Amino acid sequence: MKIIRGIHNIKEINSNSVVTIGNFDGIHLGHQKLFSHIYQIGQKYKLSTIVVLFEPQPLEFLRKNNAPVRITKFREKIRRISSYNFDSILCVKFNKSFQSLSAKDFIINILINKLHLKFIVIGNDFRFGFQRNGNINLLKKLGYKYQFNVIKIRPLYKNNIKISSTNIRKALSENNIKLASLLLGRVFSISGRVIHGNKIGRTMNYPTANILLSKNFLLTNGVYAVKIKYCPNKYAIGISNIGIKPSFSNTQKNKLLEVYLFDIKIDLYGKYIEIFIYKKIRDEQFFPSKKELKNQISQDILIVQKYFNIHKN
């Protein structure tokens, strides 16, 4: 699979293609259904399979700090899309120049002339191009003229809730991790590289692996039951604190994820790990002394161990 960074890096594609376009934030069940359609069409008609996504996501460019918070980092998004064995992922840089490109010009100049479009598979509420003027009607009109097929995937629902990135963000912001995971089709997780902390946990016999989070990270501050994937097919159960460590710092602005692993001692500094978040145990609290914090951590660990003993699968 090729990752094409920017329209200017598109090389000659020798075969016709089936394409989808979007942000695909979270790679939820709706995205997965769409990807399965692309793969099947590619196999059936011997077409190149191409996913077109935008980086940054359009609202991140347009709204800056007021943009919706990402569910999935770019690196994780690419990893999950790559698992479908598509031929190419085209990462389009969303900037002022691209923002002014009309939907019609994008379809003709990029999708048809460069990618040799024969099928396009889109979600139900898909819109694109200058002032979001590109929609299903424009695609069908141009499809008739330029001989490509348009396939619209209907939205999926779980428990009468539409599967969408917006609803997943809402669930996470309300600490409804169970619902978010249901809509994602997997346990909600975050990935990152382990950084050095201030080693306070180590002085209490609770050494932690730390990952820096953005200050507007979706989950609220608190203690969570987690599992981490630290090597291919290697997992460990642990307890995590998400927050700003109020007991020891009043200057930290960004959220930090600290995870203490049960029954395993391994140096994770510098490694890229994935943390699966299952349940919130309590809110983040201030403790006036290390002793009180240590006692609370001991209680938290018992709660998490009990949780995973009950939910072994």
Swiss-Prot record:
Q: Does the keyword Transcription regulation apply?
A: no
User: Which SMART domains does this UniProt record tie to the protein?
Assistant: Flavokinase
Entry keyword set: ATP-binding, FAD, Flavoprotein, FMN, Kinase, Multifunctional enzyme, Nucleotide-binding, Nucleotidyltransferase, Transferase
Q: Provide the E.C. number(s) assigned to this enzyme.
A: 2.7.1.26, 2.7.7.2
Alphabetical list of CDD domains matching this protein: FAD_synthetase_N (cd02064)
Q: Which Gene3D superfamilies match?
A: HUPs, Riboflavin kinase-like
Pathway of action:
Cofactor biosynthesis; FAD biosynthesis; FAD from FMN: step 1/1; Cofactor biosynthesis; FMN biosynthesis; FMN from riboflavin (ATP route): step 1/1
GO BP terms: FAD biosynthetic process; FMN biosynthetic process; riboflavin biosynthetic process
InterPro entries in UniProt: FAD_synthase, Riboflavin_kinase, Riboflavin_kinase_bac, Riboflavin_kinase_bac/euk, Riboflavin_kinase_dom_sf, Rossmann-like_a/b/a_fold
Q: Which reaction does it catalyse?
A: riboflavin + ATP = FMN + ADP + H(+); FMN + ATP + H(+) = FAD + diphosphate
- Write down the Pfam families for this protein, in alphabetical order: FAD_syn, Flavokinase
Q: Which GO terms describe its molecular function?
A: ATP binding; FMN adenylyltransferase activity; riboflavin kinase activity
**What this chain does, per the record?**
Catalyzes the phosphorylation of riboflavin to FMN followed by the adenylation of FMN to FAD.
Write out the similarity annotation. Answer: Belongs to the RibF family.
Q: What is this protein called?
A: Bifunctional riboflavin kinase/FMN adenylyltransferase
User: What gene codes for this chain?
Assistant: ribF
